[in-house]
Amino acid sequence: MRNITVAIDVMGGDHGPHVTVPAAIRCLARHPDLNVILVGPQDIIAAELRAHRSGPGPRLIVRHASQVVAMDEAPALALRGKKDSSMRVAIDLVKSGEADACVSAGNTGALMATARFVLKTLPGIDRPAIAAVMPTVSGHALVLDMGANVDCTAEHLLQFGIMGAMLVSAVEHKQNPSVGLLNVGEEDIKGNEMVKRAAELLRDSHLNFYGNVEGNDIFKGTTDVVVCDGFVGNVTLKASEGLAKMISTVLKAEFKRNWLTRIAGLIALPVLKAFKRRLDPRRYNGATLLGLKGVVVKSHGSADRYAFEHAIETAGDEVRNNVLKRITDQIQLLQRVAA
């Protein structure tokens, strides 16, 4: 198996090199087929490497970039005015073929705009989508779009379904993964005209289309893939994150209420730790910008080292399993059938 090279936007995210550099070092130690290009100000990267008793080598290359995209910077300004940013240079490395994938915890809008401008979309794909994994009672489900496209057509949702199914099939080695369309009800008569039309297209496609699913079906694990527009997807994501935090806060408060509940908390501690591990959002960090001519993975901006490692591993898995080719092949098949 050939080696995989991942370009890392060192300066992206809330914690920048204090997270991205040590996470890269740990991933290199765990994955012998992985090479890393750290992109950012050379002096900052060198200092962080020294702090972790590491340095450049055959599998760890430093590429200087003089600019940084701020987390609140307008995507258009980042695209036009920051051509030597760590984010832009990392994406350029994918475009040139020096890297197989790019990982960034930076500004989502700037990352999507820059990646789309530099890499372009795959043939037959109108718009890239953000695909992220969400926990379920039986494992996890892939949900897309998570916010890249607020307004979608039925054809866009069909393309999202194809891309999501191919990603799950390739990375998780699931034959014929099931695809659900997020709606306000399971019945065919439910939803707006765009969603109804999307259901028809998905049903007529070669995909294993389950039908309409509701929000609670995501967490029940009813389907392997859940398709929706970016507005609905982002609201779903933020609501689920808020719910998880609320449950954690309420549980802590209840167990600290009096001495009896504190004792109960100590008894339940092993179960609570297992519960926390299973729902730990760090385990699911790394949303893929699907539909581009290159693998680009977006880490959560507040990710710690453990979470950022998962984002790097997500990028590596997609390259190893040739996700881009699978998506391209399926889109071409759809176009031949339509013709």
Curated annotation (Swiss-Prot):
An MF annotation (GO) of this entry: phosphate:acyl-[acyl carrier protein] acyltransferase activity
BP term (GO), one: fatty acid biosynthetic process
Entry EC number(s): 2.3.1.274
Xref: Pfam families: FA_synthesis (PF02504)
Catalyses which reaction(s): a fatty acyl-[ACP] + phosphate = an acyl phosphate + holo-[ACP]
Main location: cytoplasm
Pathway, per record: Lipid metabolism; phospholipid metabolism
Gene3D superfamilies noted in UniProt: Isopropylmalate Dehydrogenase
Subcellular location, record wording: Cytoplasm
Cellular-component GO terms for this entry: cytoplasm
Keywords, sorted A to Z: Cytoplasm, Lipid biosynthesis, Lipid metabolism, Phospholipid biosynthesis, Phospholipid metabolism, Transferase
Biological function: Catalyzes the reversible formation of acyl-phosphate (acyl-PO(4)) from acyl-[acyl-carrier-protein] (acyl-ACP). This enzyme utilizes acyl-ACP as fatty acyl donor, but not acyl-CoA.
Matching HAMAP family: PlsX
Record-stated family: Belongs to the PlsX family.
Quaternary structure note: Homodimer. Probably interacts with PlsY.
Classification via PANTHER family: FATTY ACID/PHOSPHOLIPID SYNTHESIS PROTEIN PLSX, PHOSPHATE ACYLTRANSFERASE
Protein name per its UniProtKB record: Phosphate acyltransferase
Organism: Thiobacillus denitrificans (strain ATCC 25259 / T1)
Lineage: Bacteria, Pseudomonadati, Pseudomonadota, Betaproteobacteria, Nitrosomonadales
Gene that this sequence comes from: plsX
